[in-house]
Amino acid sequence: MLAIVAVMCCIQTVVGYSSGAATTQCVQMTPQSPHGLSQATASPYQITTNASSGYVPGRTYTVTISKINSASTPDFKGFFCQVRQVGLTTPVGTFDVADGNKAQTRDCTSTASSVTHKNKNTVTD
């Protein structure tokens, strides 16, 4: 069975790209701003999928980013997500965006291989 991992970079107070992550972030997936550092503590957000029985090639999955504790966790403004095979840096699969007001796809190594925020508005999920 092929193991897949979703990788996300959430940054709280970093000056970044208000219209989504740049394609220069496709490999490293880390903020490149001199105005802030990556978060060093556990993320207050979680990534969930509907892949309860593991990865099956060709199947469509829903990926959701949400707050772990919605009462004490601030909304987020930026995200960048890819699906990768464990140990590799090349994204696999494609994304379809459910809400075009919040997110957009990015073409990293192939069409729609990543998804990122669309604007600087806050996002609750």
Located regions from the model:
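Structured recognition/catalytic domains enriched at protein termini
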Residues: 2-125
